[in-house]
Amino acid sequence: MIIEPRMRGFICLTAHPAGCEQNVKNQIEYIKSKGAIAGAKKVLVIGASTGFGLASRITSAFGSDAATIGVFFEKPPVEGKTASPGWYNSAAFEKEAHKAGLYAKSINGDAFSNEIKRETLDLIKADLGQVDLVIYSLASPVRTNPNTGVTHRSVLKPIGQTFTNKTVDFHTGNVSEVSIAPANEEDIENTVAVMGGEDWAMWIDALKNENLLAEGATTIAYSYIGPELTEAVYRKGTIGRAKDHLEATAFTITDTLKSLGGKAYVSVNKALVTQASSAIPVIPLYISLLYKIMKEEGIHEGCIEQIQRLFQDRLYNGSEVPVDEKGRIRIDDWEMREDVQAKVAALWKEATTETLPSIGDLAGYRNDFLNLFGFEFAGVDYKADTNEVVNIESIK
């Protein structure tokens, strides 16, 4: 079929298999171009199919020749209907990894559930024996706690008072004002239950209890802080509470891993265009201004550049892992530079529907958004008849 982007709000309903494959190949080429990383050799990636999780899997495999197991929850294709992009990304990753002689297997299902944990533990036991790196990179709006059976839904709200600020509809370029009513206590609890560190700790406990973590094993989860501009809706809002919980969980997990000489880290990453960030009011406008400045300064990074730098310069740099006063790894350091943030804040005041095309990088934002779904890649013939039914080699 001929596959084109079909939009509904912040979501693209279609994905292009050849474009997703090109995206994965581009990331692999980038990693190969940067040279070997003395990293982990057996890696479990929970949330492995898009964004930072996919970039972590690619960096491990093609930077360190690691065997990887990827867990994700994606929609497979059916005739006449495309898969979700993460399915095509994972199919392409496995194809390339197997071609390179690397072990790569994937599990598709709800990583929050006991069943998928069980399946993953059994696969590690059978094929790898143990893992020495666990990446936790889940992005989901809903979680059913396997122990209580309660389904929690996260919300994106400020805490304390209504938040009003500018936002942009990145499809139309229309800058408008948005108001978000504050969260109640239940909203906060639900968001922490979904996006906090509870499930990360459950995974590590399960792996450790069955002796599936190697001596000196490391685990890492991803967080975001961001500037004052977004903090009311992000870091000081419901999501921020969840991130606080995630960051606190790193210390609990480090205690759990003491007997193995292992460690848990949270890496604070930069703002990027993802399906999740596109749905957050204020963030798309912030990102389009940030991109403009970081590109001008020559310090712009996408997911793969961020994770390559995280592995090469922080995690596997041959000495101590540099952290901030709260024990976090900071690869948002270039975004949060004072000069960069001062420029963004100045542009923010000027941003209107009329000025944004010249002061921001809305085109870059749109391009990155379409890239998430496999569109707008050079070297892909989007007019060609494309087979939407693509299989992942390890998923039968």
From Swiss-Prot:
UniProt entry keywords in alphabetical sequence: Fatty acid biosynthesis, Fatty acid metabolism, Lipid biosynthesis, Lipid metabolism, NAD, Oxidoreductase
Pathway membership, UniProt: Lipid metabolism; fatty acid biosynthesis
Pfam families assigned to the protein according to its UniProt record, in alphabetical order: Eno-Rase_FAD_bd, Eno-Rase_NADH_b, Enoyl_reductase
Residues annotated as binding substrate: Y224
Enzyme active site: Y234
Annotated GO MF terms: enoyl-[acyl-carrier-protein] reductase (NADH) activity; NAD binding; trans-2-enoyl-CoA reductase (NADH) activity
Enzyme's top EC category: oxidoreductase
EC number: 1.3.1.9
GO biological process: fatty acid biosynthetic process
Site (Plays an important role in discriminating NADH against NADPH): E74
Reaction catalysis annotation: a 2,3-saturated acyl-[ACP] + NAD(+) = a (2E)-enoyl-[ACP] + NADH + H(+)
Domain of life of the native organism: Bacteria
Tagged with keyword Ligase: no
Binding sites annotated in the UniProt record for NAD(+): 47-52, 73-74, 110-111, 138-139, 243, 272-274
Subunit composition and interactions: Monomer.
Function summary: Involved in the final reduction of the elongation cycle of fatty acid synthesis (FAS II). Catalyzes the reduction of a carbon-carbon double bond in an enoyl moiety that is covalently linked to an acyl carrier protein (ACP).
Family the entry assigns: Belongs to the TER reductase family.
NCBIfam families: EnoyACPredFabV, PRK13656.1
Protein name: Enoyl-[acyl-carrier-protein] reductase [NADH]
